[in-house]
Regions:
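Catalytic machinery of carbohydrate-active enzymes
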Residues: 1-321
Length: 321
């Protein structure tokens, strides 16, 4: 059976789909699992050994081109974890016999199986809603998956090359101060400076600040604020897979709830993560796919007094890790 899984939005969202993709593949090893992803996630999808084929949905191309790609894949069943009118209509045009998706938005009219999940109620995490949707296709499917879900044979070699090039000899505590996606709360850069210096004080770790390829200005801002400190500044320019291999060697990855947090959890790195104090952006919804014991979640309150109290707790945490 050829099974299509659609999750063609941002990095963190795609990572929440990976457990579902894994269980669909392992439900029957003869299944061919095809994913439809955004261009950003193509290389990461291709690195997963439980994904057989990757279809890249270029949002600038026509819906008819996407439908042609889907039709050529001879898909028997599709499971759409995130839907919009474009991908729904493309599947309809491709004549996929069975099309499963959450019963949301007008796009649901193009699916054969519309599943009521009410994700806005946040009764479970996003990746758990995704897993639950696979039950609609195969009621007896085993929803368990390995953690970490993604391993690389050459991860240690890539990390060692990174460590050698930056003369790193200690365990690494990494901070990723940028944010995007569903993350709508974060510490200010000056607050991050305080947290970073708290880690530096104990002398146990090498602090690394990581940045996306389009965050050069943010990197320069942090370099000015932390001038004279023993810090490695790393701008990821070699793609998500290379970045994931490097992250897998870190002791801690500290960030707001963004795609890189999910990437760190995916490869088994211990995370300390900051979430907005709202149900939509909370840890309850956006906890990641890795071992829960390796994830430490903190909500950033909206009120200044409460925010200050939580910040003091985090600062003490940074001094003691």
């Amino acid at each position: 059976m050829n099974i299509l899984v659609v999750r063609n939005d941002k990095l963190g969202d795609f990572i929440t789909a990976l457990p579902s993709i894994y269980v669909l593949k392992h439900h029957n090893q003869e299944n061919k699992v095809i994913v439809c992803v955004a261009p950003l996630n193509q290389k990461l999808a291709e690195a997963c050994d439980f994904i057989d084929e990757v279809i890249v949905d270029d949002p600038k191309s026509s819906v008819f081109r996407l439908a042609k790609q889907l039709r050529q894949a001879h898909i028997d069943l599709s499971v759409t974890l995130f839907s919009n009118t474009r991908v729904a209509f493309a599947q309809f045009l491709a004549h996929i016999p069975r099309r499963i998706a959450p019963a949301t938005k007008i796009a649901q009219i193009f699916y054969t199986d519309r599943i009521k999940q009410r994700r806005s109620e946040v009764k479970m995490a996003e990746f758990e809603y995704n897993l639950a949707l696979t039950k609609s296709a195969f009621p007896d499917i085993d929803l368990s998956y390995p953690q970490p879900l993604l391993k690389f044979e050459d991860a240690k070699e890539v990390y060692q090359e990174f460590a050698t090039s930056y003369e790193i000899s200690k365990d690494v505590v990494a901070f990723h101060v940028g944010f995007g996606g569903s993350s709508d709360a974060n510490w200010t850069l000056d607050e991050y400076v305080v947290l970073i210096r708290a880690v530096l004080q104990n002398g146990k770790y090498q602090v690394v600040l990581t940045f996306g390829p389009d965050e050069q200005k943010l990197c320069e801002q942090m370099q000015k604020k932390l001038k004279g400190e023993d810090i490695v500044y790393y701008i990821s320019k070699n793609g998500l897979v290379d970045f994931a291999k490097i992250i897998s060697g870190f002791k801690y990855f500290i960030s707001t709830s963004t795609g890189t947090y999910h990437l760190a959890s995916l490869v088994g790195t211990r995370t300390i993560t900051f979430f907005a104090d709202t149900l939509f952006a909370s840890a309850k919804r956006w906890k990641s796919v890795g071992e829960l014991e390796l994830q430490e979640h903190h909500m950033i309150p909206q009120k200044n007094l409460d925010r200050h109290l939580v910040f003091n707790i985090i600062q003490k945490k940074m001094q003691s890790i």
